[in-house]
Every structure is written in structure tokens, then in C-alpha cells.
Amino acid sequence: MVYNFKVFKKCAPNGKITLYMAKRDFVDHISTVEPIDGVVLLDEEYVRGRKVFGQMVCTFRYGREEDEVMGLNFYKELFLASEQIYPPPEKRNYELSRTQERLIKKLGDGAIPFRLTVPPGAPGSVILQPGLEDDGEPCGVQYYVKIFVGDSEIDRSHRRSTVALGIRKVQYAPAKPGPQPCTVVRKDFVLSPGQLELELTLDKQLYIHGETVAVNMCVRNHSNKVVKKIKACIQQGVDVVLFQNGQYRNIVASIETQDGCPLQPGSSLQKVLHLTPTLAHNRDKRGIALDGQLKRSDTTLASTTLLLDPDQRDAFGIVVSYSAKVKLYLGAISGELVAELPFILMHPKEGRVKMIHADSQADVEMFRQDTVHHQESVEVY
């Protein structure tokens, strides 16, 4: 029987340290986060008498690079996990994964496994879409694994003996969605009798990226006012927790209609409005929140941020939410009636291992293990 498995591979510039990782997406299950594990292949002559450390680094950029003048910078690095890889500990407090076991068997004595434990409150990988004329790194939260040679874990690493590989911290759609969203709002008028009533219902609470959101709307006009126009939109809420006034909203899909209008007093209207929030229609908008992106990978609108406790938010995080909003226009004097429903927009949990590709940060190496003849071959992509 033949087993094939692919891993990401990246070497230090001096060729003495090589990092192998089976994946670059680590799932946040809200209460816990998948550990980051891999294998480091070391040149035994080079590391003799030295120490090798592994770290998970979170970078948070909250301003444009071109605005950094006179020593001012808008960039923070957070070291969320750290471990001494070499010399290895006498006793390991975790079990090796199957990929780690296979890599150690294939690579030989110089291969050392490692595992970094991620705190559950760490922010998700989210970036803010830059403007068309902006240069430099986008604002947002990104992660990478860093392997380096140094005297201590706080020692400044040298570029030639350092490996840094970008990763992502992601969340997937929950297995059990919540109740169907529904709301009813009413508007009274000071000098007129009766009410205008707007009822909104979504067909479900959880939507997958690319799905169409069906907004079921029912208007009951018990007043003597006239509804002249209806406008619906999907809003993306972005909360940059670091700033007190860091909350704003982006319209990522919208529709305006006069079907059934003008809606006269004593009339009612039932209508279903279809809206599809996608990045394809928002590529020219600065500040749209996107899922963290690896090289050569496509991205989408940022997924909804799920929090165990909404009051316990990381100060360096970006919290994303979505809502469907419908507005009835009654004219300049009578004003408007607005209803809003929050919903969840996420990626489904992957049912199978997805295809992985090489990029400018990491090669992809395939190991082929023949368990009958105990022979192995390696192919590099």
C-alpha cells in the first residue's frame, strides 16, 4: 500500500533550518484553538551549542505604511506562543500527529517536532481592503510561524538563520445554526392617526459565502401616509477594537425598488428581496473587511466573528458582523421606517483535505511511502 502526503516546506536563507507544516489554516473552535504543529529539520553541525526557538507571531497593522513618518509607526507584533525546539525537552507533554511521525521517519535524526498552543482569545485573521492607490501592507491582523536561532526567546533573530511562514487563524460555520431571525417595527406619527408596520424575516440565520440572502418583507399601512420607495441592503459591520471610535459599516449589497409603490393608506405589501454579498462587487471599496489571505489564495468577504463572550474582545482584533436592513421612504416630511436583522456569514467546515499549492513563501513537498517495500521517494513542486 502506498501513502502520499503533502506538506509545506520553507528553508532559512543559510539552508541550515527547514520548516515543515502539514497545513497553514488553524481552526478557532471559540472555546479552544487547534494547536500549531510541525517539524523542523536542523543541520546538526550548525546548531551544536546553540538554541532554536519557535514562535507564533500576530501582526496588527492599524495605519498605512506611507503615513509612518518621523519615527511614528502603526504596527504591532504580538508573540502569542513560544517554545524552545532545540535542545529538545527530555519529556514531551503531547502526542505527535501522524504527519509528524511520518516526517520524522523520513527526515532522520535531525528532525525535531514542535507544537505551539494558541490562546483561545486571539483575534482572527482579518485584513481591510486597501484603496486602489494605496501601497504597502494592508491594515489588519495576520499571523506567521517563526523559527530562529538565538540565545533566548527574546533574542533578536538574524535573517539568514530565521524561517517565517504565514498562517491563518480561521473560524468555520457552527454545526447547529440559531433560530430564524425575525423582527417587527412600527412607526407612529405625531399629527396623524394609525401606525405603519414593517415585519422582516430571513429564511435562516446562517449563510455560506456566495449564498443569496432572502429578505421576506411584509408592510402593513394602518396610517394615512404613503410609502413611496423601498431600499434594502446588506451591511458589514467592522469594529477595530483598539480605537474607541473604530466602528463603521460598509454596504456590500443593495437593491432599490418601487414595485408595489406607492403603498396607499390601508394597504399591505408582501415581498421577498434577494441580496448576494460578494467581494466581486466590492473590490474598489476601501475598508471592506476580508478574510486573511495567503499567497496565491483567493479571499472573500470576512466571515462573521464568533465570540465566546462579546465583552471579552482582544484589543488588537477586528470584529466583523453582518445585518440585513430594509428602509421604507415616506417622503421628506413623514420620514423613514427602518428595520434591521443580524445574521451569520461564514465558510462551511471542510469535509475533506483541500488541494494545497506552493507560493512565494513556501514550497509544497510530496512524500510517497511504500509500506510494503519500505521505500520512499520525494517529489518537489
Curated annotation (Swiss-Prot):
Entry annotated with the keyword Translocase: no
Keywords: Sensory transduction
Cellular component GO terms held in the UniProt record: cytoplasm
Pfam assignment, any one: Arrestin_N
One term of GO molecular function: G protein-coupled receptor binding
Signal sequence range: none
Alphabetized InterPro entries for the sequence: Arrestin, Arrestin-like_C, Arrestin-like_N, Arrestin_C-like, Arrestin_CS, Arrestin_N, Ig_E-set
Tree of life domain: Eukaryota
One GO BP annotation of this record: G protein-coupled receptor internalization
Record family assignment: Belongs to the arrestin family.
Protein name: Arrestin homolog
